[in-house]
Amino acid sequence: MRNSHNITLTNNDSLTEDEETTWSLPGAVVGFISWLFALAMPMLIYGSNTLFFFIYTWPFFLALMPVAVVVGIALHSLMDGKLRYSIVFTLVTVGIMFGALFMWLLG
């Protein structure tokens, strides 16, 4: 014999909980746009010679794109959906990651 009680559900009881707001799409867009801005910064600083540098190192910079998107999602959710703060912090964070990779590849 088991020592348990039967659980009865009535129509008043709901099994669904209140869903939290998701911030993945705006954060992903912010992360991708900040990756594009970070990709353009070496071209603005060093000019057209950067394209020859990117010919050999494009896989490294392409690998930063999903990282930038995840950083955008994470920072947007940490900022409780405040778009202005998440844009600023994502741009700074992705720019630092991009700059660190660029300086590491330059030697």
Curated annotation (Swiss-Prot):
Compartment annotation: Cell inner membrane
Lineage top rank: taxon: Bacteria
Keyword Membrane: yes
One GO CC annotation: plasma membrane
Residue spans, topological domain Cytoplasmic: 1-20, 76-86
Intervals, Periplasmic compartment: 44-52, 107
Keywords carried by this UniProt record: Cell inner membrane, Cell membrane, Membrane, Transmembrane, Transmembrane helix
Main location: membrane
Descriptive protein name: Inner membrane protein YgbE
